[in-house]
């Protein structure tokens, strides 16, 4: 998941736009995903020359605006001059907010908790069909 979101700083059509995570493992999952981001990019990803920058000032401004729609669990560091945007995990995101209604096309990862698998399936099927959907779980 981390690699898929970080590839080209999330600026690919098949980058995952959000994560549905079972409530009972959410905190552990977030901690492990943050560690994986650190493993892949180090503690200061801005220093990594292989972590690409955001494609344009307009795209950077759009991504920056998305941060208001959740709580930053990890990341959230930005540099407009370099168009650097760190990998960012957002929690407490409203499903009706723009960050959940539009293709993100950047390194922001909203995390949406669910209790039952049927709840997650309903969440996905009520939305526009994504170009790609990735499932990681015990049953698949």
How should these model regions be labeled?
Residues 84-140:
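Conserved C-terminal structural/oligomerization subdomain of aldehyde/semialdehyde dehydrogenase
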Residues 1-94, 113-118, 122-123:
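ALDH superfamily catalytic-core signature
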